[in-house]
Amino acid sequence: MNISCSFNERLSSASSIVLSLWLSLTGLAAVIGNAAVLWLFHKNEPLRTISNRFLASLCVADFLAGLVVDPVYIAIRVFVQPRKDSILLKVIHMVWIYSTAATVFNLCCVSIDRFIAIRFPFRYQDIITKKRCYAVIIMVWLSSLFLPLSRVLIDNNPKTVEEMWFSLSFIFFEFPITVVTLCYFWIFKTVRKQTRKITVERHQTDCADTLPRARQNQKAIKTIGFVLGVFIFSWMPSLVTTVVSYVTADECLRNKLNFVVWPWIAAIGLTSSAINPGIYVFRNGDFREAWRRHFHWFS
């Protein structure tokens, strides 16, 4: 028995306005926030540590997402909807893939760098040299550039395109979520162990200098919670939606996910580019101090 599935593939006027306003504000925040971080990184020599170079690479990816991907997404969802077989849609898909890959791969690099810094503090400078840092960053951007070619090499058959997105979803979401979660799980364990050790030392020696270290560790634990929470909130819906769309046999459900649900899921993922500077950078004391020096009128 055929069940009719009737819905409008275009967003309603109210939904279009809300989505446009949402992506405009988050895109502007991503551009301004990440541009400010990159400017501070460029102007302040003490900020150019190896760890901060990974953060700078992440900021470049988030800056490009706010500058290019957000406006393009507003255009195709609100104003002009390209045909499924058009070259324009392929180009838009390539831009989306490139931006998403660059963001999530750089997030993985930041997470792995922090894991090594906390897990192996005395060997960190030997493991993560400046040369290796640049090599990893270059590899991230080259691999991000390579992945969009998958959209060029396949035809416009809906089933083939769906299989491509399903495969990419595991590269973009499953792999990074696993890496980030494992890294911050081990960081959390290490920080908790250090905090307990500091607490014991404080009770035994009543030494006042253990208090700042304890507070620093508590702040690190809070940062871990923010990082994992925002990452999972931003990207997990994309993975779930892609998987459900691929495995379901209900054509009506698949179309509703693609045309009704996906625009909002994509907007959530793009919002992370505006949030990342606040989590990864402005919780960093050195960056906050540089911000106060250069933008004292704003602070």
Task: Give residue spans per PLM region.
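Intracellular effector-coupling site of seven-transmembrane GPCRs
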Residues: V60-A61, K189-S238
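Hydrophobic alpha-helical segments of membrane proteins
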Residues: L67, P71, F146-L149, K222-V244, ...
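Fourth transmembrane helix
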Residues: A75-V78, V95, S99-C109, I116-V161, ...
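Seventh transmembrane helix
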Residues: V179-C183, V230-V243, V260-S299
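Helix-boundary and loop/linker segments of multi-pass membrane transporters
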Residues: N8-S16, N44-R48, Q81-R83, Q125-T129, ...
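Extracellular N-terminal segment of 7TM GPCRs
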Residues: M1-A36
